[in-house]
Amino acid sequence: MVQTKICGLKTPEGVTAALDGGAAFIGFNMFPASPRYISAEDAARLAPPARGRTRIVAVTVDPDDAFLDRLMTSLRPDLIQLHGRETPTRAAAIAARTGAEVIKALPVSDASDVDTAAPFDAAVTHLMFDAKAPAGAAFPGGHGVAFDWSVLKGRRFSRPWFLAGGLDPWNVAEAIGGAGAPMVDVSSGVERGPGIKDPALISAFLEAVRRA
């Protein structure tokens, strides 16, 4: 069964919709430039209903050690997603410092970008293939942009992986088939405005994944 991560949650209603729909992961975006930004402390206040029902992911961009220490004291996520320019060495150091599992997000525009995953095999527990952000974008991910899913079809990776980028309730089944994805990640595709999650769209997305 394909697993789903609902990312960029900011409200109790969004968290509830994700939990009720059976999301395997929920994500809180810690990057201040994103319209989905939430502080670690505010995310910690939303997290209690999720513990034991799903896995909590902190989405970060080039986090420093001081931030990581604060994150592990407040939110205590199960996984840390790295969505910046982190190297395999830095990713491994983050895993060792925090004790959390680590997702490395990799920007993709064509098949050659998929090959950038290999150096992270020994450093992280999960991979994510996300559409490359538009030129000049202030933040990575969450732009509602897709890439050619077929560049992932038939590829084998040593780590579990997520497909992300431009997914929504209407195209996720096609995306899963086109990429052969074992896990999917959605953010802007379940919003009614930038950073504003729609519980009905969250439910529809999770149902579409179940039916895929």
Say what each PLM segment does.
Residues M1-M183, S188-A212:
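Conserved N-terminal beta1-alpha1 strand-loop-helix module at the mouth
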